[in-house]
Amino acid sequence: MPDNRGMPVNHRMNLLFSAAVVAGAVSSAAPVSAAPDGGVPPVSAAASAAGFIDVRTIVPDAIIDLRYATANNFVGVPLYPPGARCLVHESLGAGLSAAAAALRPAGLTLVFWDCYRPHDVQVRLFEAVPNPNWVAEPGDYARSHEAGRSVDVTLASGGQLLDMGTDFDAFSPIANAYATDGVTTRQQANRSVLRNAMAKGWLAQYVGEWWHFDGPGASVDRPILDVPVN
């Protein structure tokens, strides 16, 4: 997605107060599955060489719901192979851990919709929606998701997704992180809780998508990776 950064976050906002607002704002969407119990298997040699880690090693209670591993995405078909994992660059580890820790006292859990995204998948996404306002045009370098340095996340409470006002990859102005028109007060509050928690982990909001957060160096051009997502 474009490299714009989010507006300054109000760090004085009390997370637990916001969570009280959120408590009545759980969506009626079908429950999402929790991450499997047990140890997390090692990442592939290629992923390890790229500095990638499985997000469950640093956020063990993470809920993994990779949309591009299913047909529940705007392309309508799975784009990731079976066994796809949420891989992120190790530079995001401490930040994601801090964000998750900030949410736990309020009974909230991070849900990961996308993490590292292979270049060929980015190409297919842009072919489906060739509009750089909505989908980043793939280039000669990797950055953001293609470099494993951005994540698409939402929140869950008790296994139910919170109501954020849109679904993932909503190509609409109300997907803007700070949208007010067409976004209820509760939905705005839910987005603020997510944004504030991610800010505690030094993860920057991309304004155009409330679910997208960039880690350190996300906008830096890097060589395109040949790392399988499974």
Language-model region placement:
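N-terminal twin-arginine translocation
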Residues: 10, 29-31
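Extracytoplasmic cell-surface/polysaccharide-interacting catalytic and binding patches
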Residues: 3, 32-113, 127-208, 214-230
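Bacterial N-terminal signal peptides
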Residues: 16-28
